[in-house]
């Protein structure tokens, strides 16, 4: 089970976008990297195709998972993630800072 998943609200801990927050768009567990909406933007030169016109586009670059922390559902501050088993027998994630369950 992954600690950071698609749809999670995360905070960047280091790098040029330190302190910024956003939503995880995509996670690549084999490379330990994630794409976060609006964070770590890069410019790419786009060649013209039938569907798209040429120009310079901005898109997200991947960030290493060690540079991200989940935002605590209670106060929005960075927290570590723990796992526990519910009474139903389901394994769920919780914020170690507040003890709140993390959605998903």
UniProtKB/Swiss-Prot annotation:
Highest taxon of source: Bacteria
GO molecular function: rRNA binding; structural constituent of ribosome
Keywords per UniProt: Ribonucleoprotein, Ribosomal protein, RNA-binding, rRNA-binding
Record has Calcium as a keyword: no
Annotated GO CC locations: ribonucleoprotein complex; ribosome
GO BP, sorted A to Z: translation
InterPro entries: KOW (IPR005824), Rib_uL2_dom2 (IPR014722), Ribosomal_uL24 (IPR003256), Ribosomal_uL24_CS (IPR005825), Ribosomal_uL24_KOW (IPR041988), Translation_prot_SH3-like_sf (IPR008991)
HAMAP family xrefs: Ribosomal_uL24_B (MF_01326_B)
Annotated family: Belongs to the universal ribosomal protein uL24 family.
Function: One of two assembly initiator proteins, it binds directly to the 5'-end of the 23S rRNA, where it nucleates assembly of the 50S subunit.
Record text on subunit structure and interactions: Part of the 50S ribosomal subunit.
Protein's recorded name: Large ribosomal subunit protein uL24
């Amino acid at each position: 089970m992954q600690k950071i998943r698609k749809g999670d609200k995360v905070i960047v801990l280091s790098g040029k976008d330190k302190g910024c927050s956003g939503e995880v768009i995509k996670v690549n567990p084999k490379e330990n990297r994630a794409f976060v909406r609006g964070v770590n933007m890069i410019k790419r030169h786009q060649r013209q195709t039938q569907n798209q016109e040429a120009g310079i586009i901005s898109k997200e670059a991947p960030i290493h998972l060690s540079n991200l922390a989940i935002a605590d559902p209670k106060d929005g501050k960075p927290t570590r993630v723990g796992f526990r088993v519910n009474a139903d027998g389901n394994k769920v994630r919780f914020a170690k800072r507040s003890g709140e369950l993390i959605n998903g």
